[in-house]
């Protein structure tokens, strides 16, 4: 009985806690909030019982205030395993069909309408940022964690460049190295200057519908455009990395983060403005021709290559208010993905297009 009376004294505070939500979301959600408030009060004061599994999970996801050696070992071991698995995966996706040779350099700037350079830039940025968040989770202080993130991003991309250097199909590219460094530098510069990522580098990808138009080689072999594109770019998941016709690279800016924290902007703090770059009808490094495994060459010169420039809205999921550590972790993990939104396109053919939703 005494516990019940004490709970009633807590009822106004609980209702005030849910009252703000009542003004925002009417109807069923409001009723559920009120029921939850009453249930919270009737549950009585906290006891010394062990926290529920969900609470322990939330605590596990929260960054540690001090260096947590167990987390550090877990992150280091998991990172080493992921590094090994990724290196093996990249070898099978990119390099296994080409012989290895002596280490050599190769100037590939301008190939693939520079979509591969955009890929290097955004990948180096994303790797650095996610490694930084992992370091912070273990309790490493902010500035050292930023340098660790930059080091991890540099190491991962350097692995690819070294593989390129020994592959007869490619070579070590100083242009790739420059874009890798720029991606890492964008992350590190923002972290050291603002302790925040106000400009996020993101990607979106939708594989085009290549269609069934016939292509005939000089030897009389016929394939469809879809089949030729699959020869060049592969199928999912390899095509997500390799198909430059479906990829768009974005710089997503959060305007609210440039306002003083005490000054509330007139738009949501999670709303971003994004500029994007893409290309279409890219069927080769410089020219549009695809060679299959039998040596048949299919020309696609009838499909002119062009570059695309985009302006779109976006959302910085990390800035959406939530008390759920699980959601915060998920939002951080997805922070490199551009969300579908209304988009304007300008391209090198002189066209302008509008999309209600573009991804």
Predicted regions and their residues:
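Outer-membrane beta-barrel proteins
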Residues: 133-139, 188-193, 253-264, 317-323
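Residues on the lipid-exposed face of transmembrane beta-strands in outer-membrane beta-barrel proteins
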Residues: 185-189, 249-255, 311-317, 354-356
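Transmembrane beta-strands of outer-membrane beta-barrel pores
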Residues: 205-209, 277-283, 317-319
């Amino acid at each position: 009985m005494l516990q019940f009376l004490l709970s009633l004294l807590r009822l106004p505070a609980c209702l005030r806690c849910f009252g703000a939500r009542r003004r925002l979301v009417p109807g069923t959600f409001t009723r559920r909030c009120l029921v939850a408030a009453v249930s919270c009060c009737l549950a009585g004061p906290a006891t010394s019982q062990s926290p529920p599994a969900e609470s322990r999970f939330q605590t596990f996801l929260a960054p540690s205030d001090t260096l947590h050696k167990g987390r550090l070992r877990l992150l280091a071991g998991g990172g080493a395993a992921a590094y090994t698995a990724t290196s093996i995966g990249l070898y099978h996706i990119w390099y296994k069909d080409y012989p290895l040779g002596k280490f050599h350099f190769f100037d590939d700037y301008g190939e693939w309408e520079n979509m591969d350079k955009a890929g290097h830039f955004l990948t180096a940025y994303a790797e650095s940022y996610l490694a930084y968040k992992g370091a912070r989770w273990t309790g490493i202080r902010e500035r050292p964690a930023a340098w660790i993130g930059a080091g991890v991003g540099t190491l991962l991309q350097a692995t690819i460049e070294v593989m390129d250097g020994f592959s007869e199909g490619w070579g070590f590219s100083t242009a790739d190295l420059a874009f890798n460094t720029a991606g890492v530098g964008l992350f590190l510069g923002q972290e050291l200057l603002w302790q925040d990522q106000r400009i996020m580098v993101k990607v979106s990808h939708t594989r085009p519908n290549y269609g069934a138009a016939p292509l005939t080689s000089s030897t009389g072999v016929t394939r469809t455009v879809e089949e030729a594109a699959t020869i060049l770019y592969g199928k999912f998941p390899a095509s997500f990395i390799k198909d430059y016709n479906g990829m768009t690279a974005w710089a997503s800016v959060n305007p609210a983060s440039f306002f003083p924290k005490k000054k509330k902007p007139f738009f949501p703090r999670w709303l971003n403005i994004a500029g994007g770059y893409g290309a279409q009808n890219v069927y080769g490094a410089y020219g549009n021709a695809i060679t299959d495994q039998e040596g048949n060459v299919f020309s696609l010169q009838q499909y002119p290559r062009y570059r695309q420039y985009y302006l779109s809205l976006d959302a910085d999921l990390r800035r959406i208010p939530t008390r759920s550590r699980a959601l915060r972790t998920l939002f951080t993990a997805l922070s490199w993905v551009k969300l579908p939104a209304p988009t304007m396109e300008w391209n090198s053919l002189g066209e302008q297009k509008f999309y209600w939703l573009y991804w």
